[in-house]
Amino acid sequence: MRIDFKRPAPGFDSAYFRKYYFTAATRVTTAAEMRRRADLIAAILRHSSIPVRRILDAGCGIGLLRRAFAESMPRARYVGLETSAYLCKRYHWTQGSVVDFAPRAPSDLVVCYDVLQYLDDRDAARAMTNLAKLTRAALYVSALTREDWRANCDRARTDGAVHLRPGDWYRRRLRRRFNHLGFGVWLRKDVSAILWDMERS
């Protein structure tokens, strides 16, 4: 299957979320998978002695991480940020974009899961610069890459109308302000933490 790496992103309406989140046969992820992801993030941050009191989920979708983080980090306040007017009306999320969202204060943990591939190069770069401003300590980033499309994802369940880039495109930009702890979790360079040599990626 050929894919145009510059195809425009779809509208994030009810039809989109019905296909990729609400229909079992076509959904891209499950609550159980997202719970494992939240548990992994929480474990890495606990191991690194990074306290989390405020979480920003930038591109929170239907909020699968909200309940999961409530279980793994019960003292943390969760804020869901979403561009979709449909989801903001349904779930009462904060409407906005990771490209230019500017809250009064940064969050201890920012999550940006499967968002950046929907942005063109200019907006994706702006979003990554803004993520550093939004993040007080830790950032979790996941984005569908060219390698993922070719070798890892289930294409029948994965939206291909995205901007597929090499993973290094993201990593180069993240490394300007963050150190990678592993499994998509990044720590701001100006945050004090003991990172054992062999545990760093």
Region spans (language model):
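Class I (Rossmann-like) S-adenosyl-L-methionine-dependent methyltransferase catalytic domain
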Residues: 1-105, 119-126, 130-201
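Conserved active-site beta-strand-loop modules that form the wall/rim of enzyme catalytic pockets
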Residues: 108
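A conserved beta-strand element that flanks and buttresses the S-adenosyl-L-methionine
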Residues: 111
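Short catalytic micro-motifs in class I SAM-dependent methyltransferases
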Residues: 114-118
